[in-house]
Amino acid sequence: AKCIEVSQRVRWDIERDVIRGRRFDFDQKFLPDGLSRVPDLAFLRPAEARFLSQIQGRTYANMFALVERFIGAKVIELSRDHGLGDQVAFEALVRLTDEELKHQALFRRLDAMAAAGMPEGYRFVPEPNVVASAVLAKSTWAVLGLVLDIELFSQAHYRSSIAPDPDLSALWKDVFLFHWKEESQHAIVDELEWRRCDATLTAEERERGVDDLIALVADVDGTVQLQARADADYFLRCAGRAFSAAEQDAVHDTLKKAYRWQYIVTGVQEPRFAEVLQALVTPGQLDRIGRALAPIVAHVAS
């Protein structure tokens, strides 16, 4: 009921409340240094560093549009469990789905606005419907674990990196302020649904859910590596000067680290996610998940 009350109070419109007739200021960064890892590339000139943050910001919007495709589909599926039962839960899930559809429209709008001020040749490689179909083929328990991870890291990114950075595009910051307002309620609903799903499982079903969650993390890692390569190639083509082989390798590795950090590590290290996961799985299962994540975490820290 609290989530519904807040949803009603913070509800916003894309054009009226967020965009407000503005355009992106391409003299400013989009993604903050704490997420982009751009300062690790000390050989970049200021304009190049800013451009790389804008590329990452455009991908950040597209990644959220992608994940909200399968989040909305899964949540509307879950709402059927409550349609003739708990009407408060039913309304909360329907509202969440409606907001996720709005967020997809917002992020499509951002991509078009970014395209207007960036060189041609940018590609968002993953196909949202293909990715969503693959995710939704996994067990509901695993999908809900991934969804909670995403909802929590999106909030953490805003609080710790986007909101405090004075050098970001004002429009960019507003986008993620309004996004954060609604995502804060989504995480609460997602956690309740994950716990509800978990309570229905046998030990064998939960073990399969852990297998699926590990597989989903590997799929996410493959997706972000694919986009990191595309974005690094785009940057190197459009930066306006030649880079040494070592510098090109550094750009590729930094983007791979940045995307693993943004879309995997910040989520699994979020205290609330760790707390919920630990409450649902056995120590052995938690260890298996940790071992699957270890190479990714080690690469990000290197």
Give residue ranges: language-model regions.
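Alpha-helix capping at helix-to-loop junctions
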Residues: 80-84, 98, 102, 109-116, ...
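Alpha-helical transition-metal enzyme core signature, strongest for iron centers
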Residues: 64-72, 96-111, 144-158, 179-190, ...
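Aromatic-anchored, glycine/proline-accented short structural segments
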Residues: 160-225
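Loop-centered beta-sheet repeat module
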Residues: 128-180, 184
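Terminal targeting/low-complexity segments that flank the catalytic cores of oxidoreductases
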Residues: 1-91, 112-128, 134-141, 201-302
